[in-house]
């Protein structure tokens, strides 16, 4: 019916309404109409020319202020970290990734969907943070007020899933084994390639103690059932530390683990 609509409220005064309307004012008929609340319209008008683009791009400070104001409008300070499916290809090309991305022109970068582009840029930006491995990040958590018990628990689960620990050394991503030897990430198993950046991002933001909404696609990819259980427990641990998680999954092992955690009242 033409009077059908959906209305999404972020706050009492900030909302977006999506409805059907046969609009013939344009050469291409538009049947989906989006209406924004007055508060949101005022914000967009006031910030229409806030971000100025220079040859070096948009100023980080301008972008930070804009995001801060935007979060205030939506009354949501939670940053979003999207972790897509098909992660192994990005991990497989890890050493070439910086070069490939640097050689892309602006139009090619814009052709990437926003979620994938954000994921790529986040990985490239955070790699150097793991120069001392997860243990190095764990050491920094000692000054952040995070419970040492939680850090040890997260490290233990990560070790069980990855069968080693991640390290970024001399421009190379590595999985360090218990005997001190390491395997380059592009020579590791498909399961390790799929899960390594889920683990890294979960642990990094756990240590940072910054409120995050994680959207994780198919965390079970290429993992044995036991590892699927462990990665679900790690996700639950991070969720219990003030973060929010959205999962997509086809795995009965993931769902079974979540059910058990719910029955045990640990999530």
Name these PLM-found stretches.
Residues 1, 170-267:
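Switch/communication elements of ASCE P-loop NTPase nucleotide-binding domains
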Residues 64, 69-70, 89, 115, ...:
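Low-complexity/IDR signal
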């Amino acid at each position: 019916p033409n009077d059908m609509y959906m209305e999404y409220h972020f706050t009492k005064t900030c909302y977006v309404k999506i409805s059907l309307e046969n609009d013939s004012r344009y050469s291409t008929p538009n049947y989906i109409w989006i209406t924004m609340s007055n508060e949101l319209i005022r914000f967009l008008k006031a910030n229409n020319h806030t971000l100025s683009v220079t040859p070096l791009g948009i100023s980080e400070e301008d972008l930070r202020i804009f995001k801060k104001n935007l979060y205030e409008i939506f009354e949501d300070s939670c940053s979003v970290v999207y972790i897509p499916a098909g992660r192994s290809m990005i991990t497989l090309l890890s050493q070439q990734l910086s070069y490939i991305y640097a050689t892309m022109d602006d139009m090619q970068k814009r052709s990437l969907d926003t979620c994938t582009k954000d994921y790529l840029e986040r990985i490239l930006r955070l790699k150097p943070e793991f120069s001392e491995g997860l243990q190095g990040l764990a050491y920094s958590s000692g000054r952040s007020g995070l419970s040492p018990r939680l850090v040890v628990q997260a490290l233990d689960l990560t070790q069980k899933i990855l069968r080693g620990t991640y390290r970024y050394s001399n421009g190379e991503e590595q999985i360090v084994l218990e005997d001190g030897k390491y395997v380059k990430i592009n020579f590791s198993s498909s399961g390790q390639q799929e899960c390594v950046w889920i683990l890294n991002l979960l642990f990094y933001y756990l240590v940072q103690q910054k409120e995050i909404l994680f959207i994780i696609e198919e965390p079970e990819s290429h993992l044995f059932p036991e590892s699927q259980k462990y990665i679900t427990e790690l996700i639950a641990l991070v969720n219990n530390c003030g973060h929010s998680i959205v999962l997509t999954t086809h795995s009965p092992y993931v769902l079974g683990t979540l059910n058990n955690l719910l029955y045990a009242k640990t999530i």
